[in-house]
Regions:
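Conserved C-terminal alpha-helix-loop-beta "cap" of PLP-dependent enzymes
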Residues: 310-491
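Short, compositionally biased
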Residues: 126, 131, 484-495
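Conserved PLP-enzyme active-site core in the AAT-like
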Residues: 7-12, 16-20, 80, 90-322, ...
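Short glycine-rich or small-residue beta-strand-to-loop segments that form or flank ligand, phosphate
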Residues: 57, 84-86, 164-167, 384-389
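N-terminal glycine-rich, Lys/His-bearing helix-loop that initiates the first secondary-structure elements
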Residues: 1-44, 456, 460, 492-493, ...
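Conserved N-terminal alpha-helix of the aminotransferase class I/II PLP-enzyme fold
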Residues: 46-89
């Protein structure tokens, strides 16, 4: 795509492209679905719907009528005590949940793979972090679940912590056992916050299974949705996999111990005082569509995913990571992929594919698919993450499969197999207080400095060093080795600078 002179020019050109979206947002620009459900006017005349809090429009931070109804409808749909609408994304929800549950200067136990918003909350609240290392899939080098054992050890060592933050599913779809983690956190009197930004759809997969059972079908199913597994607060990015617009999300309060007013108060401080009615309207529409047509949408989504996985295993040189294993290379094996270590398995809506056997890196595979009009979400090592959503249709999967077959035929198995960069044993940095201000310094000169921004490697997508941890020569050497091997590192800029506390 040619460079554009403005955002509008880019958006116009992008909209005109004949491409298939396997990236966020989840609606996939499927205008027809909005139109079929009676909402074409919002898309056709958006400028007239862009208003502020005029009389009759209600007020987000003091909802009494229409916005209160949307909140109540979501609470009923997800089966929770209360729902807050988010117009600053799940980021605002994560920060609000942490600040509402952890007092200033308090302690939070959190996964090292937490969203950047969690690190912002640490600074805002002067909160002391206790980091838990996620498991790593040794074969595929993907960040996996937070184990109940790891949480138990952290709780034992830090009984004064107020809350626990877990990300599940993670970016690549790997999930933690929220039921066990909830039990562990509650045993120590701690609230469990779940960043379920990538799993807003999971509750509807539950409903679909329940409906099928009511019709007499045998549907083995264990719930994945944190709302049903005892979590106290769950943050969902409805725009990532469902049908609302980018930037809109919801925060679900489930546990009786959570002070709803405390969460609402923090959100009033964090979010804009001019909330977008377009975003809130899209949240309203998303709730209505999923309530009225959710079962139909989820059934088609599941059917299409099953179709894709069964066809994908027949393509020579293609590996599809699903659970703790991968099948492919033309095996034709349709025994759908073994479960991950965690008994409930991964989120099947996240498709991680590799053609390393044909000599393609993740970047090269992404480029080849983009050339064929298939746009993925993220490259991580030899893998490409394809994010499916409620807006994808069977034709999208057909085009993806056709493109993968073409790539397989073009490269053939005679090419030299792609060898991913070597992995090195990650050192464990010492902890300090999280700094509240920072400065840029060269990586090589950061020995003894306290990190301000996380330094993250992809894969597996977990920080090497988190905010509040101390840089050492061992850590610096480890990061330099990763960079020399061509690994993707976030937190080190093109000039080799990192941000540390002052």
């Amino acid at each position: 795509m040619e460079k554009s002179k403005s955002i509008y020019d880019f958006l116009k050109k992008n909209a005109a492209e004949d491409h298939i979206s396997f990236h966020m947002p989840g609606h996939k620009a499927r205008r027809q679905l909005y139109a079929e459900c009676g909402y074409a006017d919002l898309l056709n005349d958006a400028i007239r719907y862009d208003i502020t809090e005029i009389p009759g429009a209600d007020a987000l931070y003091h909802p009494k009528t229409t916005l209160r109804a949307v909140m109540d409808n979501y609470a009923e749909l997800y089966g929770v005590r209360h729902t807050e609408l988010l117009v600053n994304g799940a980021s605002a929800g994560i920060i609000a949940a942490i600040l509402a549950c952890v007092p200033v200067g308090g302690k939070l136990i959190l996964g090292r793979n937490s969203h950047h918003a969690a690190f912002s909350a640490l600074r805002l609240g002067g909160i002391n972090p206790v980091y838990i290392q996620p498991e790593t899939d040794a074969k595929y080098n993907l960040a996996a679940e937070i184990s109940a054992y790891a949480l138990e050890e952290a709780c034992k060592a830090n009984p004064d912590a107020s809350a626990v933050l877990i990300t599940s599913p993670n970016y690549c779809g790997m999930m933690s056992d929220i039921s066990l983690l909830t039990e562990t956190a509650h045993d120590y009197g701690m609230a469990l916050i779940v960043d379920q930004a990538h799993g807003a759809h999971l509750r509807f997969f539950d409903y679909d299974a329940k409906a099928a059972r009511e019709e007499g079908a045998f549907v083995p199913h264990i719930s994945h949705a944190a709302e049903t597994l005892g979590a106290d607060i769950v943050i969902n990015s409805t725009h990532k996999t469902l049908l609302s617009f980018t930037g809109s999300s919801i925060l679900n309060i489930c546990g009786d111990s959570i002070d709803i007013n405390a969460v609402s108060d923090v959100l009033r401080m964090l979010q804009t005082t001019s909330p977008s009615y377009l975003l809130m309207a899209s949240l309203d529409i998303n709730e209505k569509i999923m309530r009225e047509r959710g079962r139909e949408i989820i059934k088609s989504w599941k059917t299409d995913l099953d179709y894709f996985y069964k066809e994908a295993v027949k393509i020579s040189g293609l590996s599809v990571v699903q659970g703790g294993g991968a099948k492919g290379s033309g095996s034709g094996d349709e025994e759908c992929f073994p479960l991950y270590r965690y008994r409930e398995g991964p989120d099947v809506t996240k498709i991680n594919i590799s053609m390393a056997e044909l000599g393609l890196s993740g970047e090269r595979l992404e480029h080849e698919l983009r050339y064929k009009g298939i746009i993925g979400e993220m490259v991580h090592g030899e893998y490409l993450l394809l994010m499916t959503g409620a807006g994808n249709v069977r034709g999208d999967y057909d085009r993806l499969l056709a493109a993968l077959r073409d790539i397989s035929a073009s490269y053939g198995i005679s090419h030299t197999e792609y060898r991913p960069p070597r992995s090195f044993e990650a050192p464990r940095p010492e902890a300090s207080d999280v700094p509240t201000s920072g400065e840029l310094v060269p990586l090589y000169a950061s020995d003894g400095r306290v990190l301000y921004d996380p330094i993250i490697t992809y894969p597996p997508g977990t920080p090497i060093v988190c905010p509040g941890e101390i840089m050492s020569m061992e850590v610096i050497g480890y990061i330099q080795n990763l960079l020399s091997e061509g690994n993707r590192i976030s937190g080190v800029d093109e000039e080799g600078m990192i941000k540390v506390g002052v």
